[in-house]
UniProtKB/Swiss-Prot annotation:
Compartments (UniProt record): Cytoplasm
UniProt-annotated binding residues for ATP: G53, V54, T55, G56, S57, G58, K59, T60
Cysteine pairs bridged by disulfides in the record: none
Chain's gene name: uvrB
Domain UVR per the UniProt entry, residue ranges: 632-667
Protein name from the UniProt record: UvrABC system protein B
Compositionally biased region (Polar residues): 610-624
GO biological process, one term: nucleotide-excision repair
Subunit relationships: Forms a heterotetramer with UvrA during the search for lesions. Interacts with UvrC in an incision complex.
Domain of life: Archaea
Pfam hit, one: UVR
Gene3D superfamilies, sorted: P-loop containing nucleotide triphosphate hydrolases, UVR domain
Role description: The UvrABC repair system catalyzes the recognition and processing of DNA lesions. A damage recognition complex composed of 2 UvrA and 2 UvrB subunits scans DNA for abnormalities. Upon binding of the UvrA(2)B(2) complex to a putative damaged site, the DNA wraps around one UvrB monomer. DNA wrap is dependent on ATP binding by UvrB and probably causes local melting of the DNA helix, facilitating insertion of UvrB beta-hairpin between the DNA strands. Then UvrB probes one DNA strand for the presence of a lesion.
Amino acid sequence: MSDTGGPLSIDRPDVDREFRVDAPFDPAGDQPEAIEQLASGYRQGMDRQTLLGVTGSGKTNTVSWVVEEIQQPTLVIAHNKTLAAQLYEEFRELFPDNAVEYFVSYYDYYQPEAYVEQTDTFIDKDASINDEIDRLRHSATRSLLTRDDVIVVASVSAIYGLGDPRNYIDMSLSLEVGQEIERDELLGQLVDLNYERNDVDFTQGTFRVRGDTLEIYPMYARYALRVEFWGDEIDRMLKVDPLEGEVKSEEPAALLHPAEHYSIPEQRLQRAIDEIEKLLDQRISYFERQGNHVAAQRIEERTTFDIEMMQETGYCSGIENYSVHLSDRETGEAPYTLLDYFPDDFLTVVDESHQTLPQIRGQFEGDKSRKESLVENGFRLPTAFDNRPLTFEEFEEKTDQTLYVSATPGDYERDHSDQVVEQIVRPTHLVDPAVEIASATGQVEDLLERIDDRVDRDERVLVTTLTKRMAEDLTEYLEESGVNVAYMHDETDTLERHELIRSLRLGDIDVLVGINLLREGLDIPEVSLVAILDADQEGFLRSETTLVQTMGRAARNVNGEVVLYADERSNAMQSAIQETQRRRRIQQQYNEDHGFEPTTIEKEVGETNLPGSKTETGGISSDGASDADEATRQIEQLEERMQEAADNLEFELAADIRDRIRELREEFDLDGGDDSDGVPAPGPEF
């Protein structure tokens, strides 16, 4: 894992530190052959490969062993924060001696600035920044610039604009014991690095002064650096716990990076301001020629204010909109992103590529359409367009070697890969579920019989419907029939989701009904039956990819079965069934040849297969408190769970718990203190 909590000295070791997987088991099933094929492919010069791995085949472990084989810095891109956090935890466990970092959007809440011409309404940018995720982003870029053994797990934030890495390097501040430097000179240099002086609230990105002692809290670190002066000489440097004040170690040297990714040297800043002022004059003239004096005044006031802030502090709110001026780029060129912090040779792993690639492809156009209105109405200069995500073509150009990972890779991955490596046989020797087609006529009554059979065997059932109304009606019908059933819908928050999954695993409920049950966290060993209603209806929820993914929910149980309710066999059904049967035959033949007997995966009920799965979400009553005392007791329990969730990087879960705490405090008029507004940051172990 990352050692940014370790010594603050330059991180690059004298001897290259190799990637080394520390797993409690060896590759098994199809893993050894897949690892060899993929590693050999990259050594032979293949740029793009696909790992087609069925659910439960250990794709993450295979990727880890490939990284160990090819020894290259690696970027892993997931399609949402939750999945990214899950992968981050897994890679941290597999690479305990290497730098495993996490890079996602640092906004708990984000409303980008926008202008609605029809109603002449300007919506200002509104955001809530998660300080801990901000720290992790800085930790990621620092690791990439100071060491070679780095794995960064990211969301699509990886393709959004970031500061010029050359500025980030050039502005680094090196300190050594015995170095002659005036204390006030060092304070000025810290301000240039966008650190703020705060002698009271000592947080990341700040420093404080006490006589001849200076304490700096790096933006990316878990510990602070105490610098003790003797006259104009650095006498001693210590790494200290900022909360406890405990000295962790004595440091001979330290390397400090800027507190902002958009930090810029003074000379470059002045050149940027000159460019901005020149463009501003041109834009004012443009609006005046159009007779749009409101827009002319608006762009002048807003831009002038930003310029004054940059001149005074080297920074302004929304500085990213001037990023093209702050770097040596021309308008229209690709922005600097996280990818530019990687060396020339690195591996990009696109996880769940069938979902992640379309997401990457769609980012550019969505950003452009929003900014067009802002620029045309005088809220931003035209160079705001250059603060953007990469186009898909730019993303491909910036990535060196790529590995697409999915149980159902799309046509793009197949067409653009030098080879597709299949991982069909699971290390657990479980086979894909048997598939049966049943008539849609009388499907509810038939389903009820199947549910009764599974309940008698102490097994669980997942049911997926096409519409919200149908899911609600089915849930009500099953309840009236005496079934312990719950309904998971799109408004189910993360905390409720954890509770539902845990209840299903414990047997408090036997059936879970939903519309789209593909989200991560539903690989539940107790589920032996997946029922897909109206399976022959064409559409996204009944496409070949979705059907194969949904069928895979029953692949963790030795008795796994899938029933498709349909009156006709659609093309998607036919393809999905054929693929599942093909995989099942391969798995059964392998088990027969090697004498393996599959068994259901055993997993502690406290886990939910979500990031930080050691967090137990049960035990907190979701019922309303009857009085203030009970509310206080519930809040104490919730606060403990909120901290646990944040420690495990389950930020969405922590935010949901925070919202429940707020509701209880408001309902009973309880004092929330100063820390009720934010999700707590993970503790030192992080």
